[in-house]
UniProtKB/Swiss-Prot annotation:
GO molecular function: carbohydrate binding; IgA binding
Alphabetically ordered keywords of this record: IgA-binding protein, Lectin
Top-rank lineage group of the source organism: Eukaryota
Composition bias, Polar residues: 1-11
Residue span of region Disordered: 1-20
Function: D-galactose-specific lectin, binds the T-antigen structure Gal-beta1,3-GalNAc (Thomsen-Friedenreich-antigen-specific lectin). Potent and selective stimulant of distinct T- and B-cell functions. Shows a unique ability to specifically recognize IgA-1 from human serum.
Subunit structure: Tetramer of four alpha chains associated with two or four beta chains.
Family: Belongs to the jacalin lectin family.
Protein name per Swiss-Prot or TrEMBL: Agglutinin beta-1 chain
């Protein structure tokens, strides 16, 4: 989910950093 995390990183912000 690293690539998906990058897209969500824009939406969720810091939460996306935890995904990536």
């Amino acid at each position: 989910k690293q690539r998906s995390g990058e897209s969500q990183n824009i939406i969720v912000g810091s939460w996306g950093a935890k995904v990536s």
